[in-house]
Swiss-Prot record:
Disulfide bridges in this chain: none
GO terms classed as biological process: sporulation resulting in formation of a cellular spore
Record carries keyword Cell membrane: yes
Main localization, broad class: membrane
Membrane topology note: Multi-pass membrane protein
Function: Involved in spore core dehydration; might be involved in the transport of something into or out of the forespore or could be required for some modification of the cortex peptidoglycan structure.
Family matches, as InterPro entries: Gate_dom, SpmB
TM ranges: 3-23, 42-62, 155-175
Recorded name of the encoding gene: spmB
Name recorded for this polypeptide: Spore maturation protein B
Length: 178
C-alpha cells in the first residue's frame, strides 16, 4: 500500500520529467513549445468566451422562466410509475445542460438522502454516466466555427439518455430498488 501512495504522489513529476527528457532527446525546444502552447490556450479561451456567456445566459433563462420546473412536473409521475425516484428527475434533465447545476443537485441529494442511499448512489452514477451535451456542443463547436450541429446534438442527447437508463439499471441491479 505504501508503494501505491508513493507512486500516486510521484506520478505527475515523473510524467513531467519524462516529457522534458523525451523533448531533450528529440531536440525539441521544450520551454519555447510550452510557452507557445500556453499562448494558443489563452487565445482559445478568449475565443470561446462569447459562446460560454451565451450558453450560461440561456441556461439561466431556462431555469428562471420556470420551463425546467414545468417539464420536471410533467415527467415526475411517469418516472415514479416505473420505480424511478422523482428526486433524480431534475438531475436527469439538467445534466445535459449544466454541469455545475447538476453537481449542485447531486450534492443536495447526497446531503439529504445520504451517499449510501439508493437516491444518493443513483445520483452519483448518473452524474458520472452523462455529460453536459449542450454545453460541450455550444462551446467547442462554436470555438471551431461549426454552425450545424443537429446530428451531434441528437447523438449526444441519445448518449445522455442511454447513460441515465444505464445508471438506473446498474444501480438497481447492484443495490436494489428505492
Amino acid at each position: 500500500m505504501e508503494i501505491i501512495n508513493w507512486l500516486s504522489l510521484a506520478m505527475i513529476p515523473i510524467i513531467i520529467a519524462g516529457i522534458l527528457l523525451y523533448g531533450t532527446i528529440k531536440k525539441v525546444p521544450t520551454y519555447e513549445s510550452f510557452v507557445e502552447g500556453g499562448k494558443e490556450g489563452i487565445e482559445i479561451a478568449f475565443s470561446i468566451i462569447p459562446y460560454l456567456v451565451g450558453m450560461l445566459v440561456a441556461i439561466t433563462v431556462f431555469r428562471s422562466s420556470g420551463a425546467l420546473d414545468f417539464i420536471m412536473d410533467l415527467l415526475k409521475p411517469a418516472f415514479s410509475a416505473i420505480g424511478i425516484p422523482a428526486e433524480v428527475v431534475p438531475l436527469a434533465l439538467i445534466r445535459p445542460i449544466s454541469g455545475t447545476a447538476a453537481l449542485g443537485m447531486t450534492t443536495d441529494l447526497i446531503a439529504v438522502y445520504g451517499p449510501d442511499s439508493f437516491i444518493g448512489r443513483l445520483a452519483s452514477v448518473m452524474q458520472g454516466s452523462t455529460d453536459t451535451t449542450l454545453y460541450v456542443l455550444t462551446v467547442y463547436f462554436g470555438a471551431v466555427g461549426i454552425k450545424k450541429m443537429g446530428d451531434a446534438l441528437k447523438v449526444g442527447l441519445l448518449a445522455d439518455l442511454i447513460g441515465v437508463v444505464a445508471s438506473i439499471i446498474i444501480v438497481t441491479l447492484l443495490f436494489g430498488s428505492a
